[in-house]
A protein has these predicted regions:
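Repeat-blade elements of multi-bladed beta-propeller folds
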Residues: 78-86, 141, 300-301
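Beta-propeller domains
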Residues: 36-66
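Hydrophobic or amphipathic alpha-helical targeting/insertion segments
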Residues: 86-103, 109-116, 125-138
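Residue-level detector of Asp-centered blade-edge/turn motifs that repeat once per structural unit
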Residues: 30-32, 83-85, 131-134, 193-194, ...
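Multi-bladed beta-propeller domains
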Residues: 1-24, 54-76, 101-125, 160-187, ...
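A flexible loop/linker signature enriched in serine peptidases of the S9 family
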Residues: 39-49, 69-75, 90-99, 119-125, ...
Length: 320
């Protein structure tokens, strides 16, 4: 029998053999008649590759080699892509710029990536992208590290809009419109389907997003700026996350007000100054995990009467 000195033993098992065949799927999004998703690719250094699977289960690679679809925002990262119509927008990890690709129906292929932003490399980061089709622009959370000069300086978070109808793409930050700023952290902007309203979350130091967050709603003017900005459930002492418009005036989100992250709703009436929410699905279990990464969604509205939601019970995730 072969023996060896402890620690110096030459094991046939190494880290490469453990991870070389491991692929994970994340960030699913229904698009056209199929599904967009990210998959880790071990053969390319475990980067995130954007894929598309159509109704015939024909799966195509969207992002080309050399692109890693991932955001560095808040260090933990955020949802790095979105899609609408024929267009896909995503964050590239290597330079933290936003790129776009289009689906070419005539050839059933995807166009080459085109840079949308030119923002000083990874000193400016983006995440939680949303497309505002009514105004032909992209809305995103921007985290700007250019102002950090000392150890006590911090990055600046803003909610920005970037016009897509310009021939001058890519554009720098000077061409972007600031919609909201002043909070230490921002995440998860969601636009109502009619393009009239916007919801997002914000929080301040020393809170983490699982401690205490603000759920902010606002009307969007035809020109694009926000007005009638209000908070749902006030400042409160709860973590509110994953806002999603079911209709133009009804907002669903998750809140741990009861001690568990459960599904709640709010009927928006901007004539009121104190918007309150109510329970949609209450259970003594969490319907999401701590929001380390922004832009996630743990529930899906099936129709006007049904919602599918994930629930963790006895350390196991289940679909309710």
């Amino acid at each position: 029998m072969k023996t060896a000195t402890p620690i110096l033993w030459d094991s046939p098992i190494n880290s490469e053999s453990i991870f070389e065949s491991k692929k994970t799927i994340s960030n699913l999004q229904a698009w056209k008649d199929g599904l967009l998703f990210l998959i880790t690719e071990p053969s390319e250094g475990n980067i995130n590759v954007l894929m598309y699977s159509d109704t015939n289960s024909d799966t195509k690679r969207v992002s080309p080699k050399g692109f890693n679809i991932r955001s560095k925002i808040h260090e933990y990262g955020g949802r790095p892509f979105t899609a609408d119509g024929d267009d896909i927008f995503y964050c590239n990890f290597n330079d933290q710029e936003i790129y776009s690709q289009s689906f070419l129906s005539a050839s059933n292929t995807f166009s080459s990536p085109v840079a949308v932003t030119d923002s000083h490399g990874d000193k400016v980061r983006y995440a939680d992208l949303s497309i505002d089709r009514k105004r032909n622009r992209l809305i995103a959370v921007r985290e700007d590290h250019r102002f950090i000069k000392t150890s006590v300086d911090e990055a600046k978070n803003s909610l920005i809009a970037l016009a897509l109808n310009t021939v001058e793409l890519p554009t720098g930050t000077e061409a972007q419109t600031t919609l909201f700023e002043g909070s230490d952290f921002l995440s998860s902007p969601n636009i109502s389907e009619d393009g009239e309203n916007l919801a997002f979350t914000a929080w301040q130091h020393p809170n983490m997003p699982w401690d205490n967050t603000e759920l902010i709603v606002a009307k969007i003017a035809d020109e694009g700026h926000l007005y009638d900005v209000q908070k749902v459930d006030g400042n409160g002492d709860s973590s509110k996350t994953q806002p999603f418009f079911v209709t133009s005036k009804k907002l669903f989100f998750l809140s741990d007000e009861s001690g568990y992250w459960n599904l709640r709703s709010c009927d928006l009436s901007f004539e009121q100054n104190d918007l309150k929410s109510e329970n949609v699905y209450q259970i003594e279990a969490d319907c999401c995990g701590p929001p380390w990464v922004t832009g996630k969604r743990n529930f899906s509205v099936i129709n006007s009467c049904e919602v599918a939601i994930s629930v963790v019970e006895s350390c196991q995730w289940r679909l309710h």
